[in-house]
Amino acid sequence: MLRSALLSAVLPLLRAQPFPCPKTCKCVVRDAAQCSGGSVAHIAELGLPTNLTHILLFRMDQGILRNHSFSGMTVLQRQMLSDSHISAIDPGTFNDLVKLKTLRLTRNKISRLPRAILDKMVLLEQLFLDHNALRDLDQNLFQQLRNLQELGLNQNQLSFLPANLFSSLRELKLLDLSRNNLTHLPKGLLGAQVKLEKLLLYSNQLTSVDSGLLSNLGALTELRLERNHLRSVAPGAFDRLGNLSSLTLSGNLLESLPPALFLHVSSVSRLTLFENPLEELPDVLFGEMAGLRELWLNGTHLSTLPAAAFRNLSGLQTLGLTRNPRLSALPRGVFQGLRELRVLGLHTNALAELRDDALRGLGHLRQVSLRHNRLRALPRTLFRNLSSLESVQLEHNQLETLPGDVFAALPQLTQVLLGHNPWLCDCGLWRFLQWLRHHPDILGRDEPPQCRGPEPRASLSFWELLQGDPWCPDPRSLPLDPPTENALEAPVPSWLPNSWQSQTWAQLVARGESPNNRLYWGLYILLLVAQAIIAAFIVFAMIKIGQLFRTLIREKLLLEAMGKSCN
């Protein structure tokens, strides 16, 4: 049985007639030839067998592709002619390629195609004409390609497309029109592409997305419109794209967006809007988009955000809100509902302060970038309950101090970047430095934070401070946090230094001077001694006064007794 099976497998190979491989080609695969060099105009002289199924021709000399180049190749299925400087193609060149399924003519110098050049290739499934010099296309060029599934016209010089150019391409799944000079897409251009899955229109000069242009593309999963000149998107332009998963609108000229523009694209998992001069966002922009994983709003002119802007994006994992020079404040609760958020980019904005609850509810947050802002202080509770937080970037702000426990109870924290801030290394920073002493590996080594003052600690890095002797008097007695408004109104305990002493201490710290500890404690002890002496004097006086009263009472009683005796 095994012997007969082997014979059955080998006999067809033995019966196959090998074809002669041209000297200038390689034939490493049966029925396939790979040739380079030579002239485009003399392909017929290579002597390629007519029973080939695959031909790859590349790096040939410039010339015109002649109509007899592939005569008799009726079984050819894959043909690739790339990097060969083809300047033109004679009519009828592909007439014998009736079984061709893939035609690749990439990276040539083709400026136009004869009207009927593709008519005989009715089985064609893939056509790639990218990286050429095509300026216009005949409206009937693709009329017979009813089985075409992939069409690449990218990297040409197309500025206009006839409205019915793709009317016969009902099986099309991929259409790449990127990197051309298109300024407008006519109505009805994509009316027949009900199976289209990928539409690539990026890097053109489109100025608008008109109503109805995309209405029949219900199967579309990827739409790329970035790097155009878009100034407007029609309301409801994306409403029929129920299967869309990726939408890119970045790098355009959009100053505003219609309300509810993304209300019906619930399947989108990636959305980019960055590098647009957006002035504001409508109160309602996104619908229930639980599948959205990434949202990019970088490089805009936004000065604030609607409070409920991201409320419906419960599955969002990455949110980029960076390089917005006018974004100076965040409304309360703007990130509410983003329970799955992992990465939050807020760097290179104009944020001067953050609310204490700005990050509340972001239990899965791992990275937050706040560098290159104008932050002068951070609330103590800003990072509270962010148990998954791993990295915090705070470089290039205006921070002078930090609460000692601002990063406490963050078990996953591995990186805190604090460089390029005007740190005031006085007793107000001491508790944070003490926390840092117990977490030495958390601070970045490349750009360590340095003290701006006071002398003599100016220009010292935090590492040098931690390695030196303690310079803050009795740091254990320092309050954990700055006093609150209620604390300022509370009565001052009698054992605290008086107001003159507090003012003197505050003036020394404000001037960046270290207080004279010995003088301070000497005055304090002298005050205690004076208080003790005064108290002793008062007690002594009270005793004497008591004794005097007792003497006077005794004498009065004696006088009264003597008076009664005389009577």
UniProtKB/Swiss-Prot annotation:
A GO-annotated cellular component: glycoprotein Ib-IX-V complex
LRR repeat residue numbers: 75-96, 99-120, 123-144, 147-168, 171-193, 195-216, 219-240, 243-264, 267-288, 291-312, 315-337, 340-361, 364-385, 388-409
Every LRRNT domain range: 17-50
Amino-acid biosynthesis among keywords: no
Subcellular location as annotated: Membrane
Gene: Gp5
Protein name: Platelet glycoprotein V
PROSITE patterns linked: LRR (PS51450)
